[in-house]
Amino acid sequence: MNKRRVKMRKEIRLSGFGGQGIILAGVILGRAAALYDNKEAVQTQSYGPEARGGASKSEVVISDEPIDFPKVIKPDILVCLSQQAYDKYKDDIKEGGVVLVDEDLVSTDKMPEVDVTMYKIPFTRIASEEIKLPIVANIVMLGALTRLTNIVSKESMEKAILDSVPKGTEEKNLLAFSKGYEVAKEL
């Protein structure tokens, strides 16, 4: 009997504003998938002309086969760390997709047009209050994303974080990842 293997292709869009580490988060996610989980991955990014405060987007496509089209069309996973990003991208999500928002920064009064699983997590508050470093909210988010979606393994993500963050910040970033992973365990 000839069994056809189902291809796995997941499209992830991370969005927010400049200065939140959206691009770095996408790089870390792509690196975890490609280098440590032995998957195919491509990461693209775009941001406004402002150095900080403008729109920022990082997209990652992860597949178990070569990626023939590197752009995200209908994300399976959407992360929004700003209201502007949520308002702009909420209706792009695939039916049955997963949406993660920073509950302190994003109002979800207007839901996506399709059925999704929505997680509201205070990424920035966790980074500020528990790690005393608001800048690691993006890494808190990656912890929750990893736990909730299993898109990459926890171990691969930890290795990719160590590869990607500035020297001297590894411990704080791993703590941020761990906090995000733990808070998602309770959801």
UniProtKB/Swiss-Prot annotation:
It comes from the Archaea. The keyword Oxidoreductase applies. Keywords: Oxidoreductase. One of its GO terms (molecular function) is 2-oxoglutarate synthase activity. It catalyses: 2 oxidized [2Fe-2S]-[ferredoxin] + 2-oxoglutarate + CoA = succinyl-CoA + 2 reduced [2Fe-2S]-[ferredoxin] + CO2 + H(+). Its EC number is 1.2.7.3. Heterotetramer of the KorA, KorB, KorC and KorD subunits. This is 2-oxoglutarate synthase subunit KorC. It comes from Methanocaldococcus jannaschii (strain ATCC 43067 / DSM 2661 / JAL-1 / JCM 10045 / NBRC 100440). The lineage of its organism: Archaea, Methanobacteriati, Methanobacteriota, Methanomada group, Methanococci.
